[in-house]
Amino acid sequence: LDAGVRVFRLDAVAFLWKESGTTCVNLPQTHELIRLFRLIIECAQPDAIVINETNVPNRENLSYFGNANEAHGIYNFSLPPLLVHALVTGTSRYLSTWMMSMPPAQDGTIYFNFIASHDGIGLRPVEGLLEKAEVDELLDTMEQFGGRVSWRQAAGTEAKPYEINIALRDALQGTTRGKDEWGLERFLCAHAIM
């Protein structure tokens, strides 16, 4: 803070607290530490902000606002996969339903909308938003376009898709019916929607 830092990005903060016998994700102690971190920062520099990077299901992501006493900003991780899904399947049903269900940001908080990152297209943020058949169709399409799928598996559970490793431009080069000449238009449309 003394050096002029005003923005603190907490990367993968959902995994901050480790406790044996748990998934070590979104534990109450993590939220307590974020509240404490924000309190200390605000006492020292009232205009400093905390941004959380939590690539988790939407409901869990929203919890990182707390009661406007945790993160000032959270990344809207559900937007990229829902937007790609809408543009390659031709249906905006899931994207529209999600958008209409999002609560407005509380006073003093903000959503960071983005449509691509260096991490690929995360799929945990669409758990509970896209049906399994929709995710499977998206995975098949992205693999046809050269994408690779990263998987996650907890002990004793079935492997689940974690993220699609593909550039946004490549992800939008066609539809579920295959590649076509409208990829650039889809890419521009994604930016216009964002």
What residues fall within each predicted segment?
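Active-site and adjacent substrate-binding regions of carbohydrate-active enzymes
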Residues: 1-194
